Amino acid sequence: MSDDFEVVRPEEQAGDEKDRDLRPRSLVDFQGQTKAKENLSVFIKAARERGESLDHLFLIGPPGLGKTTLAQITANELGVDFKVTGAPALDKPKDLAGILTTLTERSVFFIDEIHRLKPAIEEMLYIAMEDYELDWIIGQGPGARTVRIPIPPFTLVGATTRAGMVSSPLISRFGIVQRFEFYSHEELASIISRSASILEIEIEKKAAIALARCSRGTPRVANRLLRRMRDFAQVAGKSSIDEMTVAAGLKQLNIDGLGLETYDRQILRSIIENYSGGPVGAETLAISIGESQDTLEDYYEPYLIQSGLLQRTPRGRMVTLKAYEHLGLNPPKLGDGQEGLFD
């Protein structure tokens, strides 16, 4: 995998812990996701006024858009404790029981990658979410018995990048469902300016906008790129980040004006050069670029589709006219077997 993809990859990676100081701690400071934020503000206020736990919250969206941050903010706004784990860490029922039995009244329990929960763990959650009780089996064999243990009312916040892999029974137990969208350039520019202020580095407005355009609609990528631009500016002896610094830095990282890196362009070129622009199946495409199908679908395709460069069709993946233009290639003429490609 290319080094430039490590910079624009939306999933959390080593070094991103430095961004924790950049994360907003209240809904007022949280940029973007306006509708979700407005709705959540109402639900939180109502729950606080009634002295009740907030309904269970389900967050859906690509990685790096702020799902974990919003879960933490939810706990902050409610004034309650916050516990966090990932679904892969809940390997056995006792792992989940150990957390549920230590929750405090109305606390927020966040499970990331909730689509990866094992069936046995998921079934334990059903009763905990609905009745605030935990079924625990004591003993083995014919003498085994089930004891129901009460737990304090709590709010489960589940986050996923793959909602289609979450079972219907689990989804139905969430009272609030919010979908995260990619951020606009304006929203990302605001996030970059705020982060630059916290990092005590000046960034020109035009430079912030240029950086926002290359951040793949993702705050995590924007903050990561900002740190890299700070490095380039510092080594160049500059006291601020200007457009020239951003342009030179992005070129050095092999990131183009749309935020595409080497593998993005390789995907588009592979479809064009090897499959006449498509359609081509995801499995075949993943093999052709030497990546797993999950990586292709989770980390590459969402932004390529959102940017209007790639289409998912019932027959497979197809590039768009915009992809040809962006790569500086001539699109096929009608009659070359691509009659429906740009319809």
From Swiss-Prot:
Keywords from the named record: ATP-binding, Cytoplasm, DNA damage, DNA recombination, DNA repair, DNA-binding, Hydrolase, Nucleotide-binding
Record bears the keyword Nucleotide-binding: yes
Ranges where the record places region Disordered: 1-23
Chain sites annotated for binding DNA: 312, 317
Region of interest (Large ATPase domain (RuvB-L)), ranges: 1-183
Positions with a binding annotation for ATP: 22-23, 64, 67-69, 130-132, 173, 183, 220
Signal peptide: none
Transmembrane segments: none
Reaction it catalyzes: ATP + H2O = ADP + phosphate + H(+)
Region (Small ATPAse domain (RuvB-S)): 184-254
Region (Head domain (RuvB-H)): 257-343
EC number of the protein: 3.6.4.-
Localization per record: Cytoplasm
InterPro entries cross-referenced by the UniProt entry: AAA+_ATPase, AAA_lid_4, DNA_helicase_Holl-junc_RuvB, P-loop_NTPase, RuvB-like_N, RuvB_C, WH-like_DNA-bd_sf, WH_DNA-bd_sf
Domain-related comment: Has 3 domains, the large (RuvB-L) and small ATPase (RuvB-S) domains and the C-terminal head (RuvB-H) domain. The head domain binds DNA, while the ATPase domains jointly bind ATP, ADP or are empty depending on the state of the subunit in the translocation cycle. During a single DNA translocation step the structure of each domain remains the same, but their relative positions change.
Homology family: Belongs to the RuvB family.
Subunit and partners: Homohexamer. Forms an RuvA(8)-RuvB(12)-Holliday junction (HJ) complex. HJ DNA is sandwiched between 2 RuvA tetramers; dsDNA enters through RuvA and exits via RuvB. An RuvB hexamer assembles on each DNA strand where it exits the tetramer. Each RuvB hexamer is contacted by two RuvA subunits (via domain III) on 2 adjacent RuvB subunits; this complex drives branch migration. In the full resolvosome a probable DNA-RuvA(4)-RuvB(12)-RuvC(2) complex forms which resolves the HJ.
Protein name: Holliday junction branch migration complex subunit RuvB
Organism listed in the record: Treponema denticola (strain ATCC 35405 / DSM 14222 / CIP 103919 / JCM 8153 / KCTC 15104)
